[in-house]
Amino acid sequence: MQRVSELLSFLSAFRCDFFILPTPVTCPRYSVKAMKILQTLPLLVLFSSCQAHKDFFTSIGHMTDLLYTEKDLLTSLKDYIRAEELKLEQIKKWAEKFDSLSEMATNDPEGFLGHPVNAFKLMKRLNTEWLELENLVLKDMSDGFISNLTVQRQQFPTDEDQTGAAKALIRLQDTYNLDTETISKGNLPGVKHQPTLNAEDCFELGKIAYTEADYYHTELWMEQALQQLDAGEESSIDKVLVLDYLSYAVYQQGDLEKALKLTKRLLELDPEHQRGNGNLKYFEYIMTKEENKSSSSDSKDAEPKTKKGRPIDHLPERQKYEMLCRGEGIKMTPRRQKRLFCRYYDGNRNPTFILSPSKQEDEWDKPRIVRYHEIISDKEIEKVKELAKPRLRRATVHDPVTGQLTTAQYRVSKSAWLSGYEDPVIARINARIQELTGLDVSTAEELQVANYGMGGQYEPHFDFARASNTLGS
């Protein structure tokens, strides 16, 4: 409970989708372990599958559709392989048949052709059977597979999706302080599967960081790729290519000595590398220039060289935000913890909850934040998912400059909005929220269903405009 309380305390300063309510009727405390379903009333976070759409990386639901697309393609590929194998078996039988006849005939050509049946069959083979074999060899068994692939390719992810997925992985790396080797080996905490990254995967992550001018992460992932290649891993990429990217990324971070060392190693592998030779001369020139400068000046005045680290983030609360994601951050004192309780709440004597009170849990004291459990049934949840599935679209944010809604890199999710008139289930949920909180939902937003994508992200924010960020300005 303490870890959740810390998170909620921080989020309460930004967006808070929980309700702060008057002190309820206190009932005997029950075990929190008995609470099976946790639902935040105005916002349901949904992981569901839906129709194919762009920006796959922003929705786990849409990404699950890709798994089934790939499975269908794999089935089609296996069918193609079986067809090709059957074709080869037939060709082998033709070859074996012709081989035995040719061996017999060439040993005694005149005697062989002296038999009229052999002469007839020779004419037949060359005029008919070899033509049949030609048609068999020319028969394209890939038509079915290619047709299916062409159709499915329309739903394939784009370069933007691949870049988004890579950025999400890097974001998780930073948030949870994970090193590249841990991620590469798949040893992530709390996961069921342990997929590994090969050297080519690590190189691709580094390359995407490079295109974003993020040389800090470029260095991390290129070094991991190089480490795996040095360990003997077979790969389609070579060390020269990795060293080319790595040396430049290191140079961009101010470590000229290491960049020079890496460039020399590159040239040992490929002495004719044009860019490597150019960089070597340039790095040596810069180092000589700096050495002359430092020797001519007072050593006491020389500033220590500091290597650039992780890129500076625009969000002032970034450090606290990531600490809370890791379960660190603000700690509540034992005295304050003792004031937090679990109770049955009757909605201020609301008839709906008198006989069947809701389960309420204190999460934070100041400001007061409570959590409600088992407010929505599994059946209702599935219905909400069913209704939202075809409507999920990339979530947007308000642009303070244009006043328009636009997508943002820091909001990696898709959303759908459901009204009470669309289905009785939504109407019941809205009525339940109103009865529990005492608020009139007729003036509230529609029920929002959000499906977060890979490394699901929505940075801390206010739901109101500040003086420095006026709406429409």
Feature roles, as predicted:
Residues 1-44, 236-238:
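Classical eukaryotic N-terminal signal peptides for Sec-dependent ER targeting/secretion
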Residues 31, 36-473:
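Fe(II)/2-oxoglutarate oxygenase catalytic core
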